[in-house]
Every structure is written in structure tokens, then in C-alpha cells.
Amino acid sequence: MSWKTMYRSFYYQGAPEPEDIVLNAEETALLVIDIQNKYMDVPDDPDENRRWTPFFERMNSIVIPNTARLIKTCRQKNVEVMFARIACLKEDGRDRSLSQKKPGWNYLLMPQNTEESQLVPEIVPQNDEIVVCKTTDSALTGTSLRLILSNMAVKNVIVAGIFTDQCVSSTVRSLADESFNVIAVEDCCAAGLHELHEKELEIINMIYCHVASLAETISFIR
């Protein structure tokens, strides 16, 4: 099955196949979301370790290598490469959004200069590639990314990163609402559970973005 027929939600099961996608390099940007050291730290607790093992396996064997390949290809094809990472400006995190202050897994206190807030070594930015710091789920909310994309005449955004059902989904929806054409690269994304990853891609596909594989996405770029 191709991207034209995969990840069909209830609402789009009978919809016609979309037209072929052509991404002109000068009008396209790649946005890599939140692939940070924090999320590659293996939990000390044995139960949590076991619970998160499938996620770490997918990240190490699929998502990070594929994202590195996608970045390399975009650089070669003169597609603008951008990054978003969760990082607060204040050491005590007072500038964070409420969603990152609430107790639980989503409580995040990562000042911008800490090691855990940095992008993983396999996908570090080069030269003047843009990195936006956010304390929100969406990479557009609370950053200048929307204005940056507009100023650079970007119309198409390729999205990779984590977590599919959280920051990736929020960013994809924001981009769609701002009238960008969005491609979510399935095998460059992950969620805590693969079931959550698959379901969220089904939910956002064809309304907020088109979901495609790495190989398909590369073939779209002209």
C-alpha cells in the first residue's frame, strides 16, 4: 500500500486518492521535533525500563537513523532543515506553558543550556540551520517559527520527530491551520506506544497532513 491509501480514518475511508505530491525544494522545509537527549535516557526503574523498551528500540533502529538520512537528503537537495526542541529560558521554568508545569509525565523542566535539552548527537544542526526552543507542544505556538517560514517563502513542511501523538500532532495541526502543506514521515516518528503512533497518524492523515514513508517523502522532493 502507498501513502495514498494508508492510514485512512473513518472520515476518509471512501475519499478519492489524493493527487501526486511534488515538493519544490525552494518552497519546502524539514522540521525535526524534540529528538532530544532527555527522551533517550533509559529509566532506572526496571518496570519503567521494560515499559519503554519498544520505544527505545524503534528510536535507535528506525527513527533516529531514518531522520539522519532525511536530514542528509534535504541538505543535499537544498531543502531548508530546521529543528524544534523543548527548552525553557528561565532556570526555574517560570516561562513554561501550563501543560509542562502540571504533575505527571509531561512535567518538563529543561533549561536551554542543559545537556538533556540538547538534540541527540546523530541529528545536530549544521551552520546556520534554525533551531527554535519551545515550552509548548506545538512548535508554532510561542515561537517565531510561523513568521520564519513565511519570511522564507516556505509553503511545504516535512515533519519528523517525537512524540507522534503529542508535539508532532500539535505542530502538524498548527501548520495546517496556518495553510502550510504538511508531510508527516511515518518512519521518522514515534510515540510511547506504537499503537498510539499508528492511531494518531490515522487521525491526522488527509485533513492536517499527508502521512508518507521516508522513501516516499524523498521521492516527492524536486
Map each language-model feature to its residues.
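Active-site-adjacent betaalpha module
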Residues: 1-29, 38, 43, 72-77, ...
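Short hydrophobic beta-strand that contains or immediately precedes a catalytic carboxylate
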Residues: 31-33
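A substrate-binding/cap region within the structured catalytic cores of diverse enzymes
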Residues: 96
